[in-house]
């Protein structure tokens, strides 16, 4: 395999970020479609607090937020920011609890093999196959136009770089896995 999905992992082990003061217009700012974003005011987010539970889930350095985007703690931004910023924007979120950032991938690579991918009866792709000759060879984090709203991909060199940074910084919550298996 030459392409993996980059995502927040362990949603049952760490508290996710949620949109605070939900407003459809503000929440729509978090839709990740591969296009650059310019926020007049950052969307407000907060960590989910389970009101019925005395023991809260710990906070990850890369908490779950929305599909196709990554939320980063200050620690994750400091560790991964230089690498990730080559492939998109790192935007500040208005987080009530602690500094948080939104990684918006704007690097688009059309490399999905639509014919070889596994599809639902309606034609939507559930398990991706890739055209190896279109996948970048240099370290890369990217989106394919067909799955831009729901997936972030990374190639072998990018996977190796991210895994090294995550291990060196001791980051939690980031997962590099097979596409379509989360």
Predicted regions and their residues:
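Short, well-structured hydrophobic secondary-structure segments
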Residues: 56-102
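A structural signal for short, well-ordered beta-strand segments and their strand-loop junctions
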Residues: 5, 89-93, 173-177
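Short catalytic helix/loop segments, enriched in acidic residues and glycine
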Residues: 25-36
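A glycine-rich, hydrophobic loop/mini-helix early in the fold
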Residues: 37-65, 69
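Short, extreme N-terminal leader segments that mark the start of a protein/domain
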Residues: 1-26
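Short low-complexity stretches enriched in small and charged residues
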Residues: 21-23, 55-63, 106-109, 128-130
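Acidic, proline/glycine-rich low-complexity IDRs
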Residues: 31, 51, 96-182
């Amino acid at each position: 395999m030459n392409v993996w999905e980059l995502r927040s992992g362990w949603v049952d082990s760490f508290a996710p970020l949620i949109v605070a003061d939900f407003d459809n217009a503000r929440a729509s700012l978090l839709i990740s479609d591969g296009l650059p974003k310019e926020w007049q005011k950052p969307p407000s987010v907060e960590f989910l607090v389970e009101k019925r539970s005395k023991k809260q889930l710990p906070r990850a350095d890369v908490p779950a937020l929305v599909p196709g985007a990554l939320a980063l703690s200050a620690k994750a931004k400091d560790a991964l920011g230089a690498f990730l910023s080559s492939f998109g924007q790192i935007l500040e979120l208005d987080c009530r609890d602690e500094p948080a950032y939104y990684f918006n991938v704007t690097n688009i690579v059309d490399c999905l093999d639509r014919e070889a991918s596994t599809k639902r009866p309606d034609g939507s792709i559930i398990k991706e196959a890739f055209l190896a000759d279109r996948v970048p060879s240099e370290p890369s984090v990217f989106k394919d136009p067909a799955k831009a709203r729901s997936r972030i991909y990374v190639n072998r060199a990018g996977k190796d770089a991210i895994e090294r940074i995550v291990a060196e910084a001791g980051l939690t919550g980031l997962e590099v896995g097979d596409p379509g298996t989360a």
